[in-house]
């Protein structure tokens, strides 16, 4: 008799999960597991033609007992609902979201990396207008899918150099920069590819209205760290932007809560561009990026380069936050926040 979860394997995943929206009943279908890597989609689907699509990114880890835990699924479900509302996709109930994510991971459980590995299983929920529909209006057919695959940190583990992206505004003040839609990412690809060829691992966005405040990195949230000292002991102040044009990052929120639990001071507020020179560390944080140290930030038109207290190794704040956050995610530290949800076996 086989055991659940299955032991890790080294080949590709088994398939994905699908659910379809029934416009006559106004409900989503029960999720089904499809043993295929491809979707059958109408060529005139609004998701392909008009960008009517939203997505999420989340992770599953094996704990020390071999069980599989998913990190903060409720937060991702709620964020996906906000994204759906922004582009007129029917809301995906939290119960359906969890059932679909659980099914996708359970049916691919042998591909969740071992506990001792630095890798995890990346989970990609995606929803889009799927039927043939020519009008520039919300159509009647939608599809919700969940993919999963083994994954390592997007930017690696070493500090990276960043550059301010001046050629493109990521989001307008009353736009959709605060939700996860593909249109926020595709226009950046050209510039991030160019930046990588020039030696910059990541691009940073300033606010589009004044270009005087920090918004976020193209792939992740921005966190600034200032060192403090009291009684001969080093302390930390963590500063994160509260711009209305940025994604509500689940990882950034988690970092803030971990920092507070460690007794660090936390400031959530607008961050002026001119404050960059006063940070001791800068971090890029996100589900795919994890917590990445920023070695430097370059602003070309101003001929400025801000260098931080990191060279070939992450700074002390980055190391502490990464250790505690990863410890919770992998079950090595007690989950006092209630962030983890265990994947249950699916027999059908």
UniProtKB/Swiss-Prot annotation:
Question: Could you list the residue ranges forming a coiled coil in this record?
Answer: none
List the molecular function annotations (GO) for this entry. Answer: branched-chain-amino-acid transaminase activity
Identify which cofactors the protein needs according to its UniProt entry: pyridoxal 5'-phosphate
This entry's comment on induction and repression of expression is: Expression is positively regulated by the aspercryptin cluser-specific transcription factor atnN.
For this protein, the Enzyme Commission number is: 2.6.1.-
Q: Which GO terms describe its biological process?
A: branched-chain amino acid metabolic process
Query: What superkingdom does the record give?
Result: Eukaryota
* Residues at which pyridoxal 5'-phosphate binds: 79, 216
Q: Name the phenotypic consequences of knocking out this gene.
A: Eliminates approximately 70% of aspercryptin production.
Give the modified residues of type N6-(pyridoxal phosphate)lysine: 180
Pfam families the record matches: Aminotran_4 (PF01063)
Q: Which UniProt keywords apply?
A: Aminotransferase, Pyridoxal phosphate, Transferase
Q: Which CDD domains match?
A: BCAT_beta_family
Q: In which pathway does it act?
A: Secondary metabolite biosynthesis
As for what it does, the entry says: Aminotransferase; part of the gene cluster that mediates the biosynthesis of aspercryptins, linear lipopeptides built from six amino acids including 2 highly unusual and nonproteogenic amino acids, 2-amino-octanoic acid (2aoa) and 2-amino-dodecanol (2adol). The core structure of aspercryptins is as follows: Ser/Ala-Thr-Ile/Val-2aoa-Asn-2adol. The first step of aspercryptin biosynthesis is the generation of the fatty acid precursors, octanoic and dodecanoic acids, by the FAS subunits atnF and atnM.
The record's section on PANTHER family has: AMINO ACID AMINOTRANSFERASE, BRANCHED-CHAIN-AMINO-ACID AMINOTRANSFERASE 3, CHLOROPLASTIC-RELATED
Q: Which family does it belong to?
A: Belongs to the class-IV pyridoxal-phosphate-dependent aminotransferase family.
What this protein is called in its record is Aminotransferase atnJ
Recorded source organism is Emericella nidulans (strain FGSC A4 / ATCC 38163 / CBS 112.46 / NRRL 194 / M139)
Q: Gene encoding this chain?
A: atnJ
